[in-house]
Every structure is written in structure tokens, then in C-alpha cells.
Amino acid sequence: MSQLYRHSNKITLQGAVAGMLSGIAAAMPGAFPYVYGIWSIPEAKLRGVCPLTYGALVGASCGIAMCWGKIRNLTLAGVVGFASSLFALYVSWVIWILHLMFPSFWIFNPIRLALQPKVLWKIVVATNAQGTWSFKGSVPMTGTGLWLVWLGEAGLLLGFGVLAAIAMVKRRPLAVNDVSGLLHFSLEGRIVRC
């Protein structure tokens, strides 16, 4: 028997559902400060912290819920983290477009636009043609350059969402078959008999 802990790759339906719902629950209110940070931070390089933080928040929320649901499969943790982060990206786009259209309002109902993805896509394409993002106060970036910036932002958000979900599931060992409570795990991951 190996003296190091290895995940059992156990999957439970309630764990996957709890992870997804927790990620969605973190994504909706988290989109508002994320978009506020993107709009408010004047330094373009510091804006990169926003998608990292938002993605990590959504992924960590998923991972904690999956730990509660006894998910020990890292692949499933990554898939649920990716799906929740993708939802978070969509919600952030809805909030961002609404703030672009109504800059004086920070409290609004995003559901109407969120339920119309074709309309949202048309607005995104039109926004790309006009440009909204500039580097050091220059002319707003448009076209391929802006698509690449948005793609990088999406990659950071999705990547850190997946990594945080996997890290949360991976960090916590669970003795699934140990109902007697005689096995405990030390900080090094070794099994200690009591």
C-alpha cells in the first residue's frame, strides 16, 4: 500500500451540481465589481488583475462546493470550473455592454440582454468596430488588436477559473472508505494511524 494520498476519482452528482451552482452564484454578483474594476483602473497593465481575480473567485467557489459534494476527480473539477467560468465570462460581457450603453447607472437588470445572445453579439461586433479600449490614452484599439485583447482577457478568466477549481479539490484529502475515523492525514499527505 502506498504511503501517499491519492485522490479516488470519485464522482457524485450532487457534487457536480453544487459546484456548478456555486460558480454561477459567485459569477453573478462578482461581475459587477469585475466590470467596475475594468472601467475604473486607469493603468492597462493593472486591469489584468481583474480577470485573474474574477476567474479565481468563481473557480474557488466551484471547488469548495465540489469538496463539500465529495468530488475527487480533477478532470471533473476542471470541466465544472471551466463551465462556471464560461458562464461568468458571458455575465461579465452582459454587464460590460450595459455599462457601456448606460454609464451613469451601476444598478440595472441584466437579464433582458442576457437572454438575447444574438443581440449581445451584434453589440459586441459593433463595439469592436468603434473601439473602447486604449493603451496609455492613445486612439481606441479596434479590429483584430481588440479581439486579441478580449481573447487574452477571456483566457485569463477561464484559465484561472479552472486552476482554482482544481486546486480547491486537490488541496483537501478525503478518506472516503474510512467510516471508523481511524485514519488521519498529516500535512505531508502521509497516512497516520491513530
Regions found by a protein language model. Give the residues of each.
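Alpha-helical membrane-embedded segments
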Residues: P140-M168
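Transmembrane alpha-helical segments of multi-pass membrane proteins
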Residues: L76-W93
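Juxtamembrane/interface segments at transmembrane-helix termini
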Residues: V94-S104, L163-V179
